[in-house]
Regions:
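N-terminal basic/disordered segments at the start of proteins
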Residues: 1-26
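Glycine-rich phosphate/pyrophosphate-binding loops
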Residues: 24-41, 110-113, 149
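Flexible, glycine/charged-enriched surface loops at secondary-structure junctions
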Residues: 60-64, 110-111, 144-152, 211-228, ...
Length: 337
């Protein structure tokens, strides 16, 4: 059994361990889960990920309780079929999906995965990011399936839903992304739920000015019926070899202009950098590339989160990661056996 210290990371460290355990069949025990957070231990959204992993892996689990700082997870085998999980809060649906999808894909399983909760959460990849940036690359690596969103879920109400219909396909294959190629599309979309339309107009005015977008490169999506008040601004930049999605979230006492400025600056920084993958997508590519046993991509300065995830992956899989500084803000991340 692999012994893990969860003090250095948050819930993502646990979710990555669950995903790796399912993929490899290796049991693990983690202590100190979220020990340095204001509310230590497992919260409801983490428990949903544990329950999803337990169901998919037919696993024996000890310590899956609210507030628990230790967990023991022993997978027995991968089970496809139809699964549905409800987080019950605005906790991220996409993080639960990413916990169980790699193992089902790797083991050639088929099934339907539906998760209810938050789809646009400031602390997690949005449903738009998964659909437009992450999954297209996974399909190039061999993933076969369809993603859909049955409803938007914003913090704090939640109420959203995502579904992934998985078909048995090829195991993960190597992907190399040294360059992004020419940018061929830019689009900004303001998403509103029970929020005045003027908020979207103010956000998009900033994006148009910052990024030089035309009228045909902006849109507004009003969620009907609304599941609760919420607002997100999603900027998509599609290039020849990769797509980046940058998101700003409307929150209390933060102006629409400030939300749009932050997302626009992130998009501008990526456009100015000579890299294929933005920082957030870089975090998401480590596990699937490790499962393929080979891969590489160029990105900006790797986050501490990416490095800690790479170190965790190396505990479960016979791979090594290399982070190479190529100068001028460009890094090359490589994984090999």
């Amino acid at each position: 059994m692999i012994e893990l210290d969860g003090q250095a990371g948050g819930g993502q460290l646990l979710r990555t361990a669950l995903a790796l355990s399912l993929c490899t069949g290796e049991a693990f025990a983690m202590t100190g889960i979220r020990a340095q957070r204001q509310r230590p231990g497992l919260l409801r959204q983490h428990l949903t990920a544990v329950e999803a992993a337990r169901a998919v892996g037919d696993a024996i689990v000890d310590g899956a309780n609210t507030g628990s700082t230790s967990l023991r997870f022993v997978p027995k085998g991968i089970r496809g079929g139809n699964h549905r999980w409800a987080i019950g809060t605005a906790g991220s649906t996409t993080l639960v999906l990413q916990t169980v999808l790699p193992a089902l894909w790797m083991h050639g399983a088929e099934g339907s995965l539906t998760i209810e909760g938050g789809t646009h959460n400031p602390q997690a990849p949005t449903a738009d990011f998964i659909d437009e940036a992450f999954l297209p690359l996974m399909k190039r690596m061999g993933l076969d399936g369809d993603f859909s969103m049955g409803g938007h879920g914003f913090y704090p109400a939640g109420g959203g839903e995502i579904t992934f219909e998985l078909r048995a396909g090829a195991r993960p294959s190597a992907l190399h992304l040294p360059h992004r190629g020419e940018v061929n599309e830019r689009h900004a979309r303001a998403i509103l739920s029970a929020i005045p339309l003027g908020i979207a107009q103010r956000e998009l005015d900033v994006v148009r000015r910052r990024l030089g977008l035309g009228e045909d490169e902006i849109s507004v999506r009003q969620v009907k019926p609304p599941t609760g008040p919420g607002n997100a601004l999603s900027i998509r930049v599609r290039a020849e070899h990769s797509t980046a999605v940058f998101t700003g979230f409307g929150i209390k006492r933060v102006t629409a202009e400030h939300v749009a400025e932050g997302a626009s600056k992130a998009a501008q920084a990526w456009l100015a950098a000579d890299v294929a993958v933005d920082e957030h997508l870089a975090d998401q590519l480590l596990l699937p590339m490790a499962l393929a046993g080979e891969g590489s991509f160029s990105t900006t300065l790797p986050s501490d989160h990416a490095r800690s995830n790479a170190a965790l992956i190396e505990k479960f899989l016979p791979v090594e990661f290399a982070f190479r500084d190529e100068g001028r803000g460009r890094w090359l991340v490589e994984v090999s056996r």
